Amino acid sequence: MKKGQLFIGALTCLVASMSWGAMFPVADHALEFVDPFYFSFIRYGVVTIMLVILLLVREGKKSFHLEGKAKWIILFGVMAFTIYNVLIFLGQRLMGKSGIMTASIAEALMPMLSIVILWGYKHVKPKKYTMISILIAFLGASMVITKGNISFFFSLGDHLFSILFIFIGVLGWVVYTMGGQIFREWSTLRYSTLTCLFGTAITGIMTAILTAQGYVSVPSIKVIAAIKYDFLFMITLPGIIALLSWNYGIKILSSINGILFINFVPITTLLIMVIKGYNITAFDIVGTLFVIIGLILNNIYQRKEDYKQVLQKEKTNLTIT
């Protein structure tokens, strides 16, 4: 793989991760006015319309053919745009202000979950350096959020269902990220659009049923107007831009390497909290360094392995000739 491609892949994953890190503080304000179901449906309803128009213009009607992969498109769409987007914000809302950082640090679990899934389902044993890098990055993220206070984890028992919702949501996004590898022959735009279309449609159906049962209510125009800037941000940067950037980056780097960048989600959330008056501690600084070191180590070892493969191919070609 060319260095330029690796850089672009890393940059797009970083943009997506930092965008998602910024979304939790913004969502905290929006969720005071609207429930997670309508919040997710309205947000990705607009994103879906934008993606459909963009795909139609760039690739034409033929790109909407599912090519016998409907079940996978629906599965991954539900995982990302129903399970992840609804449950992670539901958990955040139920936890209150503490949900901002809890939902954010939960994202740092994604690399570990992806490795477990690959190891258990596909029997793909990760490289030793990848596992070490992930552990270092996760340790750093944990230090940033907990400030070294172990009791933080024990106090989470008071919010068992909230944590469970967030965890299931995160697991949904891991499955979606890994699912992109099945559609490598498709463009990033096509995979993003079709999964978003079906996932959001199912979220809409579920929201309509809950509304009919009286569990949630349709937000008024006045409510939407009160959080219009929240929606504008959520639809653009953590929405369509982050979605396309993430899927493109994962396509280049692979899910197991690209998902390491998700550790920048809690770091970004923390930086925003700092802007709001949060005091920086030694754990914040050391934890941030751990995350960066974890990413750099993985990148260095990956480059060495790629270089060895290139040398091996050259030796093989010389032997044949």
Swiss-Prot record:
Keywords: Cell membrane, Membrane, Repeat, Transmembrane, Transmembrane helix, Transport. The chain crosses the membrane at residues 6-26, 37-57, 72-92, 100-120, 134-154, 160-180, 196-216, 223-243, 255-275, 277-297. It is found in: Cell membrane. It is a multi-pass membrane protein. One of its GO terms (cellular component) is plasma membrane. Residues 18-146, 175-300 form the EamA domain. Belongs to the EamA transporter family. This is Uncharacterized transporter YrdR.
